[in-house]
From Swiss-Prot:
Cross-referenced InterPro entries: Ribosomal_uS11 (IPR001971), Ribosomal_uS11_bac-type (IPR019981), Ribosomal_uS11_CS (IPR018102), Ribosomal_uS11_sf (IPR036967)
Family matches, as SUPFAM superfamilies: Translational machinery components
Pfam family, one: Ribosomal_S11
Domain of life of the organism encoding this protein: Eukaryota
Protein name: Small ribosomal subunit protein uS11c
Residue span of region Disordered: 1-22
Gene Ontology CC annotations of this record: chloroplast; ribonucleoprotein complex; ribosome
Location relative to the cell: Plastid, Chloroplast
UniProt KW keywords: Chloroplast, Plastid, Ribonucleoprotein, Ribosomal protein, RNA-binding, rRNA-binding
Family: Belongs to the universal ribosomal protein uS11 family.
Length: 138
């Protein structure tokens, strides 16, 4: 009979999650990726290790409602609530993408009480790279 080995990153093994929660993070980076279909908010420390994340889909929005500004606001609030409890006071914000949730997510971040050192738009812009997809005909 084979012996069951505990998986290192499993939910049952509480060692990793408890170590994550024990860290005090005074400064971090908030990444907002706003597409037309969804908004993903990831909070990392300065070295880039993920502390918390949320998305409109993970907050319970489905279908076309995931791309709305209210869904982005909810996702940003959920992602930031955990890091504020861990003691984050200052953050940099990196916003990527053309979606409707850009401004709503930024508004939710401002309201959370975290001091923003800077807000940067890191949307990738091609220097005449790949050919874009053909126009939709509805």
């Amino acid at each position: 009979m084979a012996k069951l080995l505990p998986r290192i990153g499993s939910r049952k093994n509480g060692r990793i999650s408890s170590r994550k929660n024990a860290r005090k993070i005074p400064k971090g980076v908030i990444h907002v990726q706003a597409s037309f279909n969804n908004t993903i908010v990831t909070v990392t420390d300065v070295r880039g290790r993920v502390i918390s994340w949320s998305s409109a889909g993970a907050c319970g929005f489905r279908g076309t409602r995931r791309g709305t500004p209210f869904a982005a606001q909810t996702a940003a609030g959920n992602a930031i609530r955990t890091v504020v409890d861990q003691g984050m006071q200052r953050a940099e914000v990196m916003i990527k993408g053309p979606g409707l949730g850009r401004d709503a997510a930024l508004r939710a971040i401002r309201r959370s009480g975290i001091l923003l050192s800077f807000v940067r738009d890191v949307t990738p812009m091609p220097h005449n790279g790949c050919r874009p997809p053909k126009k939709r005909r509805v």
